[in-house]
């Protein structure tokens, strides 16, 4: 985690926005701070942003600490999401394999080009992926414990993923764990009803 912080955080503000997508995301957060409208923010002063608001909320919250929206503050949520995902992934692998394997997996994750690019960009992808990956790890742990109770933290994170880029943030983790359970011999209907309930709970913030 320390290596990832040293590789990513110091360089977030070193380059200006280099694609059309980055300023398009940042301008929505800027409009939130200027207008005070955090529910229906606008893009370029007139168009209502068509993506769910969680990523924009993140940029606006970080930028409010700095006093303005900058390249650093706009990219920081993506970097923070990556670091959280990497820590969770390390803990997940270390518990089921060993620390050496977890460390190697973390280095491979950090050195993956597309993952690194998403971690230093002002785009929704890294935040959504982090929520999905962490949710998958939590759902896997829930499955290991016999699917007892409701995995509330996974539900919360899937809800955040849904608020970041739509229903795929809940559907994908539930579908992955559902397929895994079927391959492990669990009956279709038991897997279906338990995961549908979890998925519906995670949709509550989206409504």
Residues of each region from the PLM?
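Membrane-integral, polyisoprenol-dependent glycosyltransferases
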Residues: 1-207
